[in-house]
């Protein structure tokens, strides 16, 4: 099992503070994620982490799309429902400059656990 950080939202189309969905993640290239992997979700414009999800399908290609043609299903394990309360990414050792032009990056088990614990703690409040 691998651990990932999934970048959600775009600079010109950020996630809303509330009312976002966590059912699928898209990528421009074939992702290396696999069913059963775990991930932390990062809100790009907010520069914060807000959810822990399980990847529940293998990547699927939609040849009808010209951009973001690869996607996979995700299932939230714990999520903050308001991004105003999300954890700044620097607090969990994820720096926005390392995410430039990526839709996902691999996390070390230690990075994942630090982010997971912070999200679980914040969700319990």
Regions found by a protein language model. Give the residues of each.
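Short loop/turn segments at secondary-structure transitions that flank enzyme active sites
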Residues: 12, 59, 80
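Short glycine-rich, polar/acidic loop-and-turn segments at beta strand-coil junctions
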Residues: 10, 43-46
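Contiguous surface segments at macromolecular interaction interfaces
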Residues: 1-5, 22-27, 62-125
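Short beta-strand-centered aromatic/proline hotspots
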Residues: 48-59
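Non-catalytic accessory segments flanking enzymatic or RNA/DNA-binding domains
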Residues: 18, 35, 58-62
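Short, surface-exposed beta-edge/turn micro-motifs
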Residues: 1-3, 35-39, 48-50
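Short, basic/aromatic beta-hairpin or loop at an interaction surface
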Residues: 5-21
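Short coil-to-beta transition motif at edge beta-strands of beta-rich domains
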Residues: 29-43
């Amino acid at each position: 099992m691998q651990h990932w950080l999934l970048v959600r939202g775009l600079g010109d189309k950020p996630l809303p503070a509330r009312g976002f969905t966590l059912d699928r993640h898209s990528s421009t290239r074939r992702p290396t994620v696999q069913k059963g992997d775990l991930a932390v979700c990062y809100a790009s414009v907010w520069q914060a982490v807000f959810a822990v999800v399980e990847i529940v399908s293998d990547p699927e290609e939609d040849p009808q799309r010209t951009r973001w043609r690869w996607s996979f299903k995700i299932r939230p394990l714990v999520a903050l429902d308001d991004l105003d309360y999300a954890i700044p990414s620097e607090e969990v050792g994820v720096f926005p400059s390392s995410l430039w032009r990526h839709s996902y990056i691999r996390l070390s088990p230690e990075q994942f656990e630090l982010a997971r614990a912070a999200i679980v703690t914040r969700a319990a409040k």
